[in-house]
Amino acid sequence: MDLTRTLIIGNSGSGKSWLAQRLAEQLCVPWTDLDRIHWLSDEHSIPRPRNEALGMARGAASEERWVIEGVYGWIVSEILHRATALIWLCIDDVDCVANIRRREAEAKDDERLLAMLEWAGSYHTRDDSSGCAAHQRLFEGFTDSKTQLMDRAEITDFFGAIRNTG
């Protein structure tokens, strides 16, 4: 698998950031989290203007080597043509929600967290560019190297294999 420019998609809480960070370190390439492009603040409450976000994503994807990860299909569709590899983390919604709860253990059940949990819990039924059906279309349309990982064990094994060959 040619990981020169790797794009990782999947639900919130699926492990995209975990895998992206480790791949980027292993491959010595920059890592871009599309949350940092889509949102103006760390609270994920104010979205960046669409054209500005797309411009930032295109800029990151114009580099020679990278790992980019995110849930936003409307952004991914604009940069997918630059990727040499696509990794889809298609993890069960219940596992994604549990992972978010672990990750946000210090957070109180505020409105933002509850909204994120509800959104992650609807990945397989959502009919928007960030839902499972949209990610499946992106995955099926991608003609270069790609893999679909269905659970955390597969994600860990995939990274272990990359680490052992690098």
Where are the predicted features?
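The conserved Walker
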Residues: 12
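Walker A (P-loop) ATP-phosphate-binding motif of ABC ATPase nucleotide-binding domains
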Residues: 5
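Conserved substrate/cofactor phosphate-moiety recognition/catalytic segment
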Residues: 18-64
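A glycine- and Lys/Arg-enriched "phosphate-lid" helix/loop adjacent to the NTP-binding pocket
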Residues: 90-134
